[in-house]
């Protein structure tokens, strides 16, 4: 990183841009907590995120710094800070770029579950949907050719996943001891990971093929010797993935699939579905997107209770055989008002979860958001049984600067 920054001495001056956001959030749980030590009712918190960017006058050199922090009144684990992004990027005159530092990379096409999105670790204290990610240290070389784009990654500095604390909601029956992770076999915190991705457009097809070898971002768990907590266990895995999207007028056909080895038996998982958009409904400028997806996961999962070092199972998942349906409504107004709602049903036991999200800009610098998640008819053997009392409603007000 320092060597890369040394090259800036010969670059033109450029300009700095500074922005960011501060938000106040209130989350309400209408049902009493299911487990001891968990709080009831209200969970107020606040976040601050800065955004500092510099680009040289010739556009070849770029610096991005995006720190993030949250202060939570109920869950100590949710009070945390992270460098979401902090990198230097060089853009050549020809067809390649080089990025050095911490960054966020997104792969995927579907709505319900991002199977192929493997580069960044999930910031699990932020929300249950796994959309929030921690910054990942990396060296990324991107080649932009006529035959497509090739991204090559070297990923030092593994990030462990964050989880709610003993007093937090949306957790398992036993809290997770994030201070004592276990790295099995060749996995270790300092191990270097590697990844590559090829992507391109072929007519109406958008295709991505990826490979990853390194420490899994998705831990399995074992019970701590005290019996009072779970310990996350991180394995070394090799994963290949494919994501596709086909555009046909108002139809978007989407799919993601992975094959993973290193966590029990090698297994396949996939998500496939569509989004169909109805334009200008009710003779208004509103666009309604209708979504449907099927989720399959063939892993042999479960708690790992055997002695460390024996053959491991894969991390457990709630998506072995599920159907997701949803709707996305864009009002296309000057306030960027939008809504998204979805329902997931477990085909095997009929457990059901749903969410509703809505947001609207207030003036030039403010945004209001509402989010609700609900759990219905949850089977006691379903992974969601630990959060069946954790229906919640969140209101968030953000000021941009």
Regions found by a protein language model. Give the residues of each.
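Detector for outer-membrane/organellar transmembrane beta-barrel domains
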Residues: 58-61, 250-345
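Transmembrane beta-strands of outer-membrane beta-barrel pores
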Residues: 24-30, 54-58, 67-73, 104-106, ...
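Outer-membrane beta-barrel "beta-signal"
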Residues: 141, 274, 387-401
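Outer membrane beta-barrel
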Residues: 53-170, 203, 375-377
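Residues that define the transmembrane beta-barrel architecture of outer-membrane proteins
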Residues: 40-48, 79-84, 133-137, 144, ...
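Membrane-embedded beta-strand positions of outer-membrane beta-barrel proteins
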Residues: 20-22, 65-67, 100, 141, ...
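Surface-exposed beta-loop-beta
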Residues: 169-267, 271
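Short loop/turn motifs that connect adjacent beta-strands in outer-membrane beta-barrel proteins
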Residues: 11-18, 54-63, 94-99, 147-149, ...
